[in-house]
C-alpha cells in the first residue's frame, strides 16, 4: 500500500515534512494547500504534486492521510474535520494551547475512530531512540533520574513569541514529552522556575527565555529540564538517564564527526545550528512510523493523548512559576 498524502501548510516545517513524505518509498505527496499560493506552488513544483484547497483535500478520494503544519490555532479544527472525513492525521505540536479544547478534539477523534499522531519528533532521533532501547533492555536497571538539556542558538522573533503560548508550551513541551518517554511513569508534580536573561523584549511580551523544571512521579522518579533561548556555541541537545545499575547518555551531535589534534590543541567542528539539521533523521523516522502504522493498522505514537499530557505539564509549569510553588497534576 502506498499512503497518499495531502500537506496542509507550506511554511518552514511544511517543507521539512514534504521532503520526508516524498522521500519515503511507501508514500506519495498528492497535494498541498496553503493560504499563500506562492508557498504552496513552490512545494508543488519541488515534489511534483498539485496545489489544492483544504476543502478539496478534505473531500478527495485520492488522499489517505494529511500532515497538518498550519498555525497552532487551526490545528484542533482541522483535526476534527479530517477525522470526520476519514483521513489519517499527522499534526505538528501542539494540538491547541488550551487543554479543554484539546480534550474536545480528542473526543471527536475517538468518536470517529480516527488515527492521529502528534509531531514529537525527538522520540524518533536515532540517539534518543538508542537511549530508550538501553532502558528497555535493562542496561541501566530501573530508571531513577532523567536530565534533559535543550538550548536554542537564539530566540525567535518577539512577534512569534507573542502567539506561541510561551516557552513552556512552545519549547519545553518537547522535553515534557521526552521526559514521559524516558521515565516510564507519568509525572504527578511540577516545579518550575523562569527568568528573562537573554532579551528584555521577551519579558515585555509576557514570556521567559531561561527556565528550569523538575518533574516527579508517584514513585519518586525525577526529570530535570534546563532550557534557554541562547546558546552561543550551537544547538545544545543532551539527555542523561541515571538508573539503579548505571547511566546512559546522548551527547550533542555535530554536522561532521571529526576531531583534530595538533600543536594548537584539540578542535572539533561546531554543533548543528538548529533543529532542522539536528533532527533531519528524526523527521524522516517519525513520518516513516506514521506511514507504517497507517499501512498496518497498528497503534500510533505519539498519540493525541501524549499531546494532551505534555500540554498539561506545560500548563502546570506556567502555574508553578506564577504561584511560586509545586503544582500537582490532576489525574
Predicted feature locations:
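C-terminal helix-rich "cap/oligomerization" subdomain common to oxidoreductases
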Residues: 1, 65-68, 290-331
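N-terminal Rossmann-like dinucleotide-binding module
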Residues: 1-47
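Short acidic low-complexity segments
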Residues: 50-61
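Hydrophobic residues in well-ordered beta-strands that form the structural core
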Residues: 53, 90-91, 116-118, 147, ...
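Beta-strand-loop-alpha-helix segment that lines the small-molecule cofactor/substrate pocket
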Residues: 64-65, 71-72, 76-123, 138
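Basic phosphate/pyrophosphate-binding loop/patch that engages nucleotide-derived ligands
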Residues: 107-115, 129-143, 242-243
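Rossmann-like dinucleotide-binding domain that binds NAD(P)(H)
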Residues: 158-222, 228-233, 305
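NAD(P)-dinucleotide binding in Rossmann-like oxidoreductases
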Residues: 196, 201-207, 218-285
Amino acid at each position: 500500500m502506498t499512503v497518499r498524502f495531502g500537506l496542509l501548510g507550506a511554511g518552514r516545517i511544511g517543507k521539512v515534512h514534504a521532503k520526508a513524505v516524498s522521500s519515503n518509498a511507501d508514500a506519495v505527496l498528492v497535494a498541498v494547500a496553503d493560504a499563500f499560493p506562492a508557498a504552496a506552488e513552490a512545494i508543488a513544483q519541488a515534489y511534483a504534486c498539485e496545489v489544492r484547497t483544504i476543502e478539496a483535500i478534505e473531500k478527495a478520494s485520492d488522499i489517505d492521510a494529511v500532515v497538518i503544519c498550519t498555525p497552532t490555532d487551526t490545528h484542533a479544527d482541522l483535526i476534527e474535520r479530517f477525522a470526520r472525513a476519514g483521513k489519517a492525521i499527522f499534526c505538528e505540536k501542539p494540538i491547541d494551547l488550551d487543554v479543554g479544547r484539546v480534550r474536545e478534539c480528542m473526543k471527536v477523534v475517538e468518536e470517529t475512530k480516527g488515527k492521529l499522531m502528534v509531531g514529537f519528533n525527538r522520540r524518533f532521533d536515532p540517539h534518543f531512540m538508542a537511549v530508550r532501547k538501553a532502558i528497555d533492555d535493562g542496561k541501566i536497571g530501573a530508571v531513577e533520574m532523567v536530565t534533559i538539556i535543550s538550548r536554542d542558538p537564539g530566540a525567535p522573533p518577539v512577534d512569534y513569541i507573542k502567539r506561541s503560548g510561551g516557552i513552556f508550551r512552545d519549547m519545553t513541551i518537547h522535553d515534557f514529552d521526552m521526559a514521559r518517554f524516558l521515565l516510564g511513569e507519568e509525572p504527578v508534580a511540577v516545579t518550575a522556575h523562569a527568568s528573562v536573561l537573554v532579551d528584555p523584549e521577551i519579558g515585555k511580551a509576557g514570556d521567559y527565555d531561561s527556565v528550569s523544571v523538575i518533574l516527579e512521579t508517584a514513585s519518586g522518579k525525577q526529570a530535570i529540564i534546563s532550557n534557554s533561548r541562547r546558546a552561543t556555541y550551537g544547538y545544545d541537545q543532551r539527555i542523561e538517564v541515571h538508573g539503579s545499575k548505571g547511566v546512559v547518555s546522548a551527547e550533542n551531535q555535530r554536522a561532521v564527526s571529526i576531531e583534530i589534534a595538533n600543536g594548537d590543541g584539540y578542535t572539533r567542528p561546531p554543533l548543528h545550528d538548529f533543529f532542522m539539521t539536528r533532527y533531519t533523521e528524526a523527521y524522516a523516522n517519525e513520518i516513516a512510523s506514521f506511514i507504517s502504522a497507517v499501512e498496518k493498522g497498528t497503534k500510533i505514537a505519539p498519540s493525541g493523548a501524549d499531546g494532551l499530557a505534555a500540554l498539561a505539564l506545560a500548563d502546570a509549569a506556567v502555574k508553578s512559576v506564577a504561584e511560586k510553588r509545586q503544582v500537582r497534576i490532576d489525574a
